[in-house]
């Protein structure tokens, strides 16, 4: 059957390209795990298993895949089966598909890709956290002015400031680690919907593919969107925290505040104004984070009011879009780490703001309460009036 050229170009060819780029290795792993299970359960005779094994080994070494989907096949799955048929014959190649479907295969591949994304993000976050903690230890007594509602509020240490973001990230990493466990359930064996009459061993396939367990309900296995929506919600939270912190750093590096600055290798100048030093790395963090967040947030809308079935919203084109957003997110982390580690505190400016704004007087009011036994609210009014008169 010849497919529409428009549909073939816009949908099927892009699906094929995505499989070739991102999912070929997981696809090969699923084939091997499924064959091992078919052999161990004696669903396939030894002679057929041997023939398929030889074909898969040959397919593993295959190079020079067509850059575009061949017209005679619908997708990468059928291209792979057609190629395997050329190696070992149609009967043996077709036997590899006993007790499975593209439904359970595809969502298994997507989960394998997603768990790699999650694992890579967690590893990178741990590196970032270690760098921020080490940096904070070097600034345990470095003073910084902290703001509330855009106004100077209290003085603290730079380590305290960074530590707040470290704590936020640790919470998100913990939640994403839990999400990983949800993603790491194996759909294989669900087949199209209702499993199969063959005596398969779902746990064996799950184990071979590195999953913690099979997904018990086969309809959930091929219908759920949790493998995608749960992790991206945690990434949205993470990126939201990053952009808020970056915006706060941008405020502190403004000319009017001036307690943070960046070295020359992280600023850009104006094409006409010679005095300008723009810390644009902070803006690019916001841009990349915003682009990734936009994609992640779109997935909730994508699944809104869709049928709870095996549907293409739960498919590879969605995953392809996700992969691009993950790249933006990982680059956001690289830029954020660079901005954190290279930011410089201007202690004289911190002291100037502290003196002019009276941000140490909260402790003064508390000390009056402790030492003079004055009522707290009275002490508060005394100090407030003192600051007000001193600022005239």
Model-derived regions: residue spans:
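Glycine-rich cofactor/substrate-binding loops
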Residues: 1-30, 88, 92, 273-392
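Generic, well-ordered alpha-helical scaffold segments in large soluble proteins
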Residues: 34, 38, 55-59, 83, ...
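A helix-coil-helix interface module used to build multimeric assemblies
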Residues: 1-195, 200-203, 266-269, 280-284
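Charged, flexible cofactor/metal-binding loops and thiol motifs
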Residues: 107, 111-118, 122-126, 137, ...
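A structural signal for small-residue-enriched, beta-sheet-centric alpha/beta enzyme cores
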Residues: 102, 215-219, 357, 365
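Short linear loop/turn motifs
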Residues: 51-54, 219-224, 381-386
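Conserved hydrophobic residue
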Residues: 43-44, 258, 374
């Amino acid at each position: 059957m010849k497919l529409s050229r428009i549909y073939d170009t816009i949908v099927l060819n892009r699906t094929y390209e995505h499989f070739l780029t991102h999912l070929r290795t997981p696809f090969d792993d699923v084939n091997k795990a499924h064959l091992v299970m078919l052999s161990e359960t004696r669903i396939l005779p030894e002679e057929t298993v041997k023939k398929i094994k030889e074909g898969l080994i040959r397919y593993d070494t295959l190079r020079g895949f067509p850059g575009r989907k061949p017209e005679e096949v619908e997708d990468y799955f059928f291209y792979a089966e057609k190629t395997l048929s050329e190696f070992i014959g149609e009967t043996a190649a077709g036997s590899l598909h006993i007790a499975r479907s593209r439904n359970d295969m595809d969502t298994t591949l997507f989960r394998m890709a997603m768990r790699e994304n999650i694992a890579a993000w967690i590893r990178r976050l741990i590196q970032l956290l270690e760098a921020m903690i080490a940096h904070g230890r070097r600034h345990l007594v470095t003073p910084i002015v902290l703001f509330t509602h855009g106004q100077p509020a209290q003085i603290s240490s730079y380590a305290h400031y960074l530590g707040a973001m470290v704590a936020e990230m640790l919470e998100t990493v913990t939640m994403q680690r839990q999400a990983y466990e949800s993603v790491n359930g194996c759909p294989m064996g669900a087949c199209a919907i209702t499993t199969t009459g063959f005596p398969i061993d779902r746990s064996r396939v799950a184990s071979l593919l590195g999953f913690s367990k099979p997904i018990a309900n086969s309809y959930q296995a091929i219908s759920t969107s949790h493998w995608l929506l749960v992790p991206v919600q945690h990434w949205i939270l993470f990126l939201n925290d990053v952009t808020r912190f970056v915006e706060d750093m941008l405020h502190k590096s403004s000319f009017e505040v001036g307690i943070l600055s960046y070295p020359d290798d992280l600023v850009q100048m104006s094409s006409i104004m010679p005095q300008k030093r723009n810390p644009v790395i902070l803006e690019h963090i916001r841009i990349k984070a915003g682009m990734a967040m936009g994609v992640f947030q779109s997935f909730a809308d994508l699944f809104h009011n869709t049928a709870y079935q095996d549907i293409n919203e739960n498919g590879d084109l969605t995953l392809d879009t996700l992969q691009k957003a993950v790249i933006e997110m990982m680059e956001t982390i690289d830029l954020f780490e660079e901005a954190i580690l290279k930011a410089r505190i201007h202690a004289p400016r911190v002291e100037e703001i502290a003196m002019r704004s009276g941000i140490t007087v909260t402790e003064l009011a508390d000390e009056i309460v402790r030492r003079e036994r004055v009522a707290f609210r009275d002490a508060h009014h005394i100090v407030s009036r003192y600051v007000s008169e001193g600022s005239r």
